[in-house]
A protein has these predicted regions:
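Active-site core of metal-dependent hydrolases
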Residues: 1-74, 85, 95-97, 129-131, ...
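Generic structural signal for individual residues within well-ordered alpha-helical segments
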Residues: 32, 120-121, 160
């Protein structure tokens, strides 16, 4: 469910929602509850980052761009809290229109707040948990979908290798078939 503050998130959790999309304005108490109950959060912070920078180009008035900046900052501040609380944080794709090419910018944006391995895990094993597809995606294992990328460098040292629409990926394999390389 796409939710931002405690009132909405609490209501959704009480109703059985298992994954909060965004959650930019959730409190420490709500983060603790999500961690305790084993629920997931998919922040997709890059959406707010790009809208804060390009919102005027998309026709948003200055007041909306300012509000988005506040929401962006709040969401980024939550990343470390979610990580330290042990919340499963997935990697989302909630971008619209012309912003979609910026999706992979989420890697470097999160990397400013989290260890690289946690950022990569959010797009692999944690994303699989969010989608209830553990062992099928986000893993190199017998019976998994065999979606793999070969990266030109070490993304644990440089998360930007995972950005720019595959520019640093000489080989991309999906479902066991080479799509690039």
């Amino acid at each position: 469910a796409h939710l931002y503050d405690d009132t909405c998130i609490t209501r959704a959790l009480d109703a059985g929602v298992e994954c909060v999309e965004h959650g930019n304005r959730m409190s420490d108490e709500t983060i603790a509850r999500i961690a305790k109950e084993g629920q997931c959060v998919v922040p997709t912070n890059i959406t707010y980052d790009r809208l804060a920078k390009e919102g005027a180009e998309y026709g948003l008035p200055p007041e909306s761009v300012a509000k988005i900046e506040d929401v962006r900052e709040a969401g980024l501040e939550r990343l470390d809290k979610l990580y330290k609380a042990g919340v499963t944080v997935g990697y989302g794709s909630d971008l619209i229109g012309g912003m979609h090419p910026h999706q992979s910018g989420e890697f470097t944006l999160r990397g400013q707040y989290l260890p690289a391995d946690a950022v990569i895990r959010s797009a692999t094993v944690d994303a699989a948990k969010v989608l209830r597809m553990e062992g099928e995606i986000g893993a190199i294992a017998p019976g998994a979908h065999a979606d793999l990328i070969v990266v030109d460098g070490n993304p644990l040292e440089d998360l930007s290798l995972l950005t720019n629409q595959g520019a640093h990926m000489p080989m991309i394999m999906q479902g066991g078939k080479v799509k690039k390389g």
